[in-house]
Structures are given as structure tokens and as C-alpha cells.
């Protein structure tokens, strides 16, 4: 941990939040002289204070320890670049249309990668909608967690649960991409 980098980061974040050293110190329960010492690179925050700093500045503790924030390159959030993330502990599903650092349950998440396997499915067009029926058991050990249909400007996300019928209704499928995530078999691009 480089105290100079950490101090510079705390200074920039404090200024962003429009806080004085005294106001920040009062929120954490320390003296303003301590904040001044950190910002000059003459010391680093105690481990017990990192959680408070993280909450006040709304950044990860790791970023405070690293002493720098990296901003993403703005790519316009094109839906062609959509990434899906699934937490292995709680099953939370997250998406992003640009590169992003995502964590859940205290762990950094990587975007799902498409596997070569396909789940067999049938598609019927009914009343301007597409009914997709999957050949899947939908047991607690092996079920489809979600189906997503991505078009150029939007996406449709349907969450499925164990013991539920393995079928979903979507707007009539045209030129988008159809994704499916099975707990056992992984993330698939359906064709």
C-alpha cells in the first residue's frame, strides 16, 4: 500500500464529495489532523477505518488500498457488447453493456463465457409472440436460471426457477441473439 497514492485518492474523493477534512473526520470518528496526515502521504488509514471510508466515498476497499480509480472507456453502451454475470454463491444475475468491475458476496465476478453445448428447444409463434419450450428437467440440481433475448437497442430477461415449466414467452424473435444459462451446463447462445 503506497501511502502517497492512498492519500491522493482520499483527497480527490473528499473534494468530489465536497467535504472538509473536519467533516470527513467527524463521519469516521477521528481527528482532522489524521485526515491531513493521510492526504500528505505521511500515513495510511487503519484497517478498521477502511469500511467507513468505503461507504462514505462509495468505492471498494480494494480501490482505496490500491490508491487509484480507473475509469472505463466510454463505448456508448452498445447492446452488442452486453455481458452477463452470475454470482456463484447467491445466484444473483447482473448485466452490463460495457466493461465494468462487478462484485457480489465479496467476490469479483467475471463475465459468463459461451459454451459449445446447446439445450434443445422448440419455438412456436403465437399471437405476435414466440413461445420457447426447452428440453430440460428443471430440478433443483439442473435447471435453466434465465433466458435473455438481446436486440440492438434492448434486451428481454426472463428468470426461471426449479420445478417451473421450462418455457418462456418473448416478443416475436427477429434479428436478436437468444441466450440461456443453465446451472449445470453453462451459458449458451441458442441458434
Task: List where the protein language model places each region.
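Cys/His-rich microdomains that often coordinate metals
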Residues: 93-94, 108-109, 186
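Residues immediately within or flanking Cys/His clusters that coordinate Zn2+
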Residues: 82-84, 101, 179
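Short alpha-helical DNA-recognition segment
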Residues: 18-36
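A short, Lys/Arg-rich alpha-helix, primarily the initiator
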Residues: 1-16
Amino acid at each position: 500500500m503506497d501511502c502517497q497514492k492512498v492519500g491522493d485518492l482520499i483527497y480527490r474523493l473528499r473534494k468530489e464529495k465536497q467535504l472538509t477534512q473536519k467533516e470527513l473526520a467527524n463521519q469516521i470518528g477521528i481527528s482532522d489532523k489524521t485526515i491531513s496526515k493521510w492526504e500528505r502521504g505521511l500515513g495510511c488509514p487503519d484497517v478498521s477505518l477502511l469500511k467507513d471510508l468505503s461507504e462514505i466515498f462509495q468505492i471498494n476497499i480494494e480501490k482505496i488500498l490500491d490508491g487509484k480509480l480507473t475509469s472505463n472507456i466510454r463505448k456508448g453502451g452498445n447492446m452488442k457488447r452486453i455481458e452477463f454475470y452470475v454470482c456463484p454463491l447467491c445466484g444473483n444475475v447482473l448485466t452490463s453493456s460495457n466493461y465494468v468491475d462487478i462484485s457480489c458476496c465479496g467476490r469479483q465476478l467475471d463475465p459468463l463465457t459461451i459454451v459449445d453445448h446447446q439445450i434443445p428447444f422448440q419455438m412456436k409463434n403465437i399471437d405476435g409472440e414466440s413461445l420457447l419450450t426447452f428440453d430440460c428437467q428443471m430440478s433443483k440440481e439442473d435447471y435453466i436460471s434465465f433466458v435473455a433475448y438481446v436486440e440492438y437497442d434492448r434486451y428481454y430477461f426472463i428468470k426461471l426457477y426449479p420445478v417451473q415449466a421450462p418455457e418462456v414467452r418473448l416478443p416475436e424473435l427477429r434479428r436478436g441473439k437468444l441466450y440461456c444459462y443453465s446451472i449445470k451446463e453453462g451459458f449458451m447462445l441458442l441458434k
